[in-house]
Amino acid sequence: MRKDLTIALPEGYETGTSRHALLLTLDPRLPASEIAGRLRAEGVLPPMIVAVRAEGSTAEASELITHLIFTYRILEASEARWMCGTGHSAAEALRLVLNRPDLAGRAACLSTSFEGAEGAPPLHSRLLRELEERTELPSGVKLFLDYGTIGLDECYEPYHRDVGAILRAKGWKDDREFRITRAAGGSHDPASWQNRLGPGLRWLAGR
């Protein structure tokens, strides 16, 4: 499992005994440690253990978080365990928070690929169907979702419109459990995502 992760520990971790919040990044192209460090310096985020899934790793998010919990001093409250992802890994992060809120309670989902590997339109999106079929949504979790307006991301607006309607119909409220943001000028690429991760983490932190 070690080969599947790159770990950045907060200052003083190795000589201390306190537990810390966790940020697990499922896309190694996101400079999550740098962005989290900047937000920490601004007082937005607490000191966090930042773990990045290695490129090419086939380990699932649930496996990685379970390993991290048993290996590092991570806070027990699930709201202190965050995830972020892009495209298909954003869909993975969203699923984990909804299906295993005991493992992770926050997720920043950038350019979520609701169409899946099969490229399904909104009406046939497997992830949207899963959401519609749920009898209830977990409480105490928060999801940040965004999509751009250029290239592939331009096609994501109807998916996000539908997911917003589903979440509201099941009792969630905008800016309480979730936020959906249309990132003007945003696109489906790492340069755009790294500019959008900060605002996502800031919202998850309540700032």
For each of these PLM feature ranges, what is it?
Residues M1-R207:
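Non-catalytic cap/lid and distal C-terminal segments of serine-dependent acyl enzymes
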